[in-house]
Amino acid sequence: MEFLVKSVRPETLKTATLVLAVGEGRKLGASAKAVDDATGGAIGAVLKRGDLAGKVGQTLLLQNLPNLKAERVLLVGAGKERELGDRQYRKLASAVLSTLKGLAGADAVLALGDLAVKGRDAHAKARLLVETLADGLYVFDRYKSQKAEPLKLKKLTLLADKADSAAVEQGSKEAQAIANGMALTRDLGNLPPNVCHPTFLGEQAKALAKEFKGLKVEVHDEQKLRELGMGSFLAVAQGSEQPPRLIVLQYNGAKKDQAPHVLVGKGITFDTGGISLKPGLGMDEMKFDMCGAASVFGTFRAVLELQLPINLVGLLACAENMPSGGATRPGDIVTTMSGQTVEILNTDAEGRLVLCDALTYAERFKPQSVVDIATLTGACIVALGSNTSGLMGNNEALVRQLLKAGEFADDRAWQLPLFDEYQEQLDSPFADIANIGGPKAGTITAGCFLSRFAKKYHWAHLDIAGTAWISGGKDKGATGRPVPLLTQYLLERAK
C-alpha cells in the first residue's frame, strides 16, 4: 500500500473515495463542512434524514454527489465531541478500511486531520491512523490453496494542513516502518513449527541482512554455544533433533564508540514442555513461543527502514523444547555461562534457561540498556490478561522509559515488582538457584530468575505471554506486539 500526504482542499480532489468524519449530533468538521458546502448541503440533508447517527465506526457510503470530483464519499462516525481516544480512533480507522476493502476504487483520500483525538498531536494521530490501516491489511495465507482476493485499493492519501504536513509525513513514515516490522513478526510467529525452527530463523536473519545493508549477522551453532559455556541454553535443546542457534544482529547507526542498546528475544520455536509435558489441548499454539525473538526481528526491520541514528544489538536465543530419551529431566543441574548453577525442577520453565545465557552474553557489548522479550509465563496472562504486557527491571528510569513508550505507541505494559522477598522462592538445596519458584507470583519469580543474570547493566524484562498472539477462533494468530512499544523506545533513545 502506498501512503501519501497532501495539503489541498478535499472538495477539489479527484479520487475514487473521499473519507469524511461526522460526529454525533450531525457535527461536521472543517473538511466535511467544506464538502457539504460544495455539494449544496447534500451531506447535511443525508444526516438530517437520520441515516448516520455518528457513533464511532458507523459508516455510510454516498455516490455521485454534485460538484465533486470524488466518485464516492464515505462518511464515518467519530462519536461525541472531545471524547475520541486511541481505542475509538483505531475503531474508526478499522471501519474505514473494512469498507474500502469492499469497494472497486484503487485509491482513497482520508480527510480526517481535523478530528481531535485526546492527547494526540498531528504526528501522533497520523502514526496511529496509518499503523492501524497498514496492520489491518495483513494477510497470512501462505499455506492456503485458496488465496485471498488481491486488494483493488493501492493508494491512501492523508490530507493535512500545511502547518502540520511535515509532522503528518513523519508520523506516516514511522507507522509504515512499524507496520512492516509487525508484519514480519506476525509472519514468523504464524509459520508452522516444522518450517520455523532455529536453523530457519538463522536463515531469515541472513535474508534480512541482504535486504538491509546496515545489518550484520552472526549465527552461533551448538558447538559455539558449548565453547561459550551455555549449559543452560543447551539443556533446553538437547531433547530435540533441531539444533539450537544463538542469532546475533548488529546495526550501527550512530558513532562507533556509542554504547548499544540490546534486545534479547526468547525463540522457542516449539514448546512441548519437554519431560514436564504440556496438556495436548492447545499445544499447537506453542509455535508462538518464539514471538519474543520474532518481535526483535520486527523491531530491527523497523529501525533499519527508518535508519535510526542508534547502535542496536539483537540476541535471539532459539531452540526447540522436546521430550526424548536425551531430554533434560526434572532434577538435572546445569551450569550457566555466568557460572551459576541451576536446578531444573520443571522442564516447561525453559524460556528463562535460554534467556539467562543470552543475558550473560550481552555483557560483552557494554550496553546502555538490555531489554529481554519473552512469552515467559502463563501467570502473566492470569495477572494482566491479553491487553497488557508485564514489565520488570532493575533500573527504574529504564522501566519508566518503556512504560512511556508503550503509552505513546498504544502498546502498553504494566510494571510488576522485583522485591527481594520473591528471590527466596528460587532457593535450591542442591544448586545456586531453582528454575521455578512455586505456584505463587509466577511472573515475578521468573523475572527474579532473570535478574540474577543481568546485574552488570540496566535491564528490563517484557513478558508478552498474553499479548504476542490471539488464542483460538477465527482471529487466531500472532499480533506483532510489542514491536510498536520497542520501536518507540528506540525512537526516543535516538533523539
UniProtKB/Swiss-Prot annotation:
GO terms for cellular component: cytoplasm. Mn(2+) 2 binds at K266, D271, D289, E350. SUPFAM superfamilies: Macro domain-like, Zn-dependent exopeptidases. It catalyses: Release of an N-terminal amino acid, Xaa-|-Yaa-, in which Xaa is preferably Leu, but may be other amino acids including Pro although not Arg or Lys, and Yaa may be Pro. Amino acid amides and methyl esters are also readily hydrolyzed, but rates on arylamides are exceedingly low; Release of an N-terminal amino acid, preferentially leucine, but not glutamic or aspartic acids. The keyword Magnesium does not apply. The active site is at K278, R352. It is found in: Cytoplasm. Mn(2+) 1 binds at D271, D348, E350. HAMAP family: Cytosol_peptidase_M17. This is Probable cytosol aminopeptidase. It comes from Pseudomonas paraeruginosa (strain DSM 24068 / PA7) (Pseudomonas aeruginosa (strain PA7)). The lineage of its organism: Bacteria, Pseudomonadati, Pseudomonadota, Gammaproteobacteria, Pseudomonadales. The gene is pepA.
